[in-house]
Structures are given as C-alpha cells and as structure tokens.
Amino acid sequence: MKTYNAYDTIHELALEQHGVFTAQQARAVGVKTTALVMMVRRGRVERLAYGLYRDPGAPLSRWTPYVTAVLWPQGMTGVLSHETALDLMELSDANPAKIHLTIPRKHRPRRRKPPPGVVLHFADLDPSDVGSVEGLPVTKAARTIRDVAAANIGPALIRQAIDDARQKGWLEPIDGDALTRELVAAGKL
C-alpha cells in the first residue's frame, strides 16, 4: 500500500506547471496548509509571494517566469500581454525586460506586490481577446498590437508586429488591413 506524501503530491503538481503552484492548488490536491508551511520551513518548497510557491526539485524552464506571473493573482488567472505577448508570439523585435500581465480592473491588489519583474495592466478582457501560447493565456495579436500602440511603443515596431502577425497566421489579411487603418486614423502609425 502506498502512503500519502505531501511533498510527492506537490512535486507532481509543480512539474506540470514549470515548478510553480499556488496554495489554492495545493489544497485542491489534498495538501494541508500546515504541511505546506512545514515544507517551506524545511526548504523543500520556496515561497515566491503570498500564496505562490516554487518546488526547487522541479527544473526551471524558459516558461517558469511566465507561469509565475500568470498564477500570481489569487482567485483568477492573469493574461500575458503587451510586449510580453509580442515576444511570445514572435511578433516584431520586441524584447521586453519585464513581464507584462493584464488582470481585471476590479482586481487591484492593495497589499500584495506582483513578483519582481512583472508590470501590471488593468483591463476587462473579452474572452475573444485571449488566446494561448504553450498553454499560457496570452492576449491575441490584434488586442496585443492595440495595447502596445496605446502604450506608444513606436510605429516601426507596430508595423513589424502587424506584418509578422499576418505572415505567422495570427492575423487574417483583412483583419490586418482593418487594424492598420484603425491605427493610422488614431495617429499611431
């Protein structure tokens, strides 16, 4: 008969999410809060932020910082956006120094700071504006390009993003043309 081991349960969960998990997810798989606290004290688990943990036994990957950002907002999932979304979809030469995350307007954390290197944006995203890259929620190309245009990223990068989105199939040609006209009319191109 196999005995229950809280760490093994956490480790399996963390492996599925590039080493990162939330306290809420740990409880959902049967790990008690007291067991999680003991794992932190013993160094088996690292506390990244309030309710957010990393298993040092799980290998880090390119995706670990993104998963950390997405899981950080408790009770909901953030959406990778702006320059981060451009980078993940490989649209333009955007190379953001920070991870951009959009969360709903009503979800404004007062006491909790986001993980280091995460920039928060607040918007109520329509489900049709959210896609996926490597299983991570990411704003779709048209929404992303509108967001970076509103943030004044620069016309050359915006043009390149539109062209790349068309070539890679993230934007239909007719949608790319409409987006270009919209941004020209708004003075962004």
PLM feature segments, named:
Residues 2-189:
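Short gly/ser-rich loop at a beta-strand->alpha-helix junction or flexible surface loop bordering the NTP-binding
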